[in-house]
Amino acid sequence: GAVDFVMCRKDGIYSDGRRPDSVEPGTILDDLKRRDFTVNAMAIDEEDNLLDPFNGQEDLKNKLIRCVGSAEERFNEDSLRILRAIRFSITKGFGLDDEIWDILFSPKIWVPKLESISQERIQQEIHKCLAHDTVQTLDFLRSISRLWTTAIFSQGLWLKPTKEQV
């Protein structure tokens, strides 16, 4: 597996729906609190002890995508996280927490927030899903409101042609 070494930081508020307005040095707990999902909010300290303040290991074991803290708060910070949750569900075979489903079934509130995200970033997430399993991705998108698919595919979607070998 991959090991990621980063400086711990504490984020300020997110007024643009993408990046924090300010960043300052922080503790490991500050850094883990700003993560999107519990399975991404674990660390190992210098004595090889697992730091898991949001029960990410349990969610990993149960194959569940759950937000650190409030899903609404995490997705307001960066709306692309909604699509990341969908991608992890599709590519990793994880279920989604009820709070995330509530957001997916509230498209009139959440779909407009995708407008702050570049179409390129949206397409990157969708391409990763489609590359993993096209049918499952399309089935998933069909299962949620058409408002989502309209927003996701508003600029169209270019896929590389594929050829089945016989």
Which residues are covered by each model-predicted region?
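Catalytic cores of the polymerase beta-like nucleotidyltransferase superfamily
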Residues: 1-166
